[in-house]
Design a protein with these regions (language model features):
Chain B
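N-terminal, polar/charged subdomain of small-to-medium soluble alpha/beta proteins
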Residues: 2-108, 114, 123-126, 130-173
Length: 85, 173, 173, 85
């Protein structure tokens, strides 16, 4: 399975902190995972995960651009630009 | 997986030259300064300590809540310290970041370095802080009389962090 | 009129926004940080604290003695703080300098500022320290296994102080 | 009288922390005071106060270039470049 985490405003607006996706041939990259999530028709998934939204991603706790490869067992996280400090 | 409410494990330690920490407990800035200055060989001539505190913004901010990505935030913080210490000759460096709930005036973050000379200390501390602001997975939510909302990332912070990329480090990676 | 061995009078005070001090007693850096952070209106988002300490220089320095020009050193220090606070919007600023005899690892000077934003805090603190090094009538004498001698002024320090003149302040005077 | 103070290495090498000079028509500036001191033939005054030595001066606790005016009652100080911090 691919574990997917959401943080901060994205987590709050989705109403979910975590979902899982079954690995599939069409889920090769971070961009693919995001597109799969944006294809969900329940709730605000399409809006909040659309490519128009400025979101960052990490794969296994390392920042990951959209083309980063994803495989079974990975943890993918999506979140808004960071605002610490 | 919402707000982290545990003090993260310390793989690093006060005994080594680098010390990062994500913590829910209040930050003790005096202790940070003391640790930086305690260089037993006497080779550190300069320390620079930065603290970031919750601003009340004329009463518009009464409380601040900080969410992080447990595990990743510690990893990124540790990596930033290592990178900064590769660019400037540092004897000690620390970065402690608080998460969870805090109020106006509370310290959110303390970043400090010790070096032989002051120019390196100022530059390294400033760079480390700019990168903490833009690279560690942390998110602020502020509460005031009009309710609460997530803080937007500032272009000025991204520009500040880019300064350091333009002048070396990132180019070499 | 040789080595100053009195704590100079404090015309300024911890109750105001600026605090300068020439002192023979050891410097308490934690107290300096605490004073900077204690901004009751919560308007200060950033503090930067610099400390300069006696370096042992691989055992070549066992003791350091600092002479000053009593009266003038306090006056110059107070003037530098005022000038820096005119250039950057500071909420608090301090400069405490030790004189007399000290040993390796002891703090010689602590300079710190509090401001709303970090860029101003870093720049103001760095400028204040560069100017303290080159404008306050203070002289170091170091002692080691080979005897004692006065420290020569460094061109690098003069160049560092000139940076701030080139980019504004002094031009406006 | 004009009070004259010396600090640090200059004080040590001269063997004096303070001297006084009577006001005189030819003592108009800091440079004049320095020249008068350098004219002393006892000890190392000529050497240590010669114009070749890099020295700073203050008049009444304010940094003063050589052309600064000096008058009766002033306190003039000479010292090497500062090395605090």
């Amino acid at each position: 399975m691919i574990r997917i985490l959401f943080f901060a405003s994205l987590r709050e607006r989705l109403g979910e902190a975590e979902v899982t996706l079954a690995p599939a041939p069409e889920l090769k990259t971070v961009a693919d995972v995001r597109a799969a999530l944006a294809a969900r028709t329940d709730g605000r998934w399409a809006e909040l995960l659309s490519v128009e939204q400025l979101l960052l991603a990490a794969v296994n706790e390392t920042m990951a651009p959209p083309e980063t490869a994803v495989q079974d067992g990975d943890v993918v996280a999506f979140f808004p630009p960071v605002t610490g400090g | 997986m919402t707000m982290a409410d545990t003090i993260s494990s310390d793989l690093n330690s006060p005994d080594g030259p680098f010390w990062h920490r994500i913590q829910t407990a209040p930050i003790d800035c005096g202790a940070a300064q003391q640790w930086l200055s305690a260089d037993i060989v006497g080779a550190a001539g300069a320390t620079v300590l930065f603290t970031g505190q919750v601003r009340s913004e004329q009463g518009q901010v009464s409380a601040l809540s900080l969410e992080h990505y447990p595990g990743m935030s510690e990893k990124v913080l540790a990596g930033l310290i290592r990178e900064v210490a590769q660019r400037w000759p540092l004897l000690r460096a620390l970065a402690w970041h608080r998460v969870g709930d805090m109020g106006a005036g509370d310290a959110i973050v303390v970043v400090g370095v010790a070096a032989a000379h002051r120019q390196a200390a100022f530059e390294a501390c400033s760079c480390l802080m700019d990168r903490v602001k833009t690279e560690v997975p942390l998110w602020k939510k502020v509460s005031g009389p009009d309710g609460s909302d997530w803080v937007d990332a500032r272009d000025a912070d991204l520009a500040a962090a880019r300064r350091w990329h333009d002048s070396g480090e990132a180019d070499e990676r």
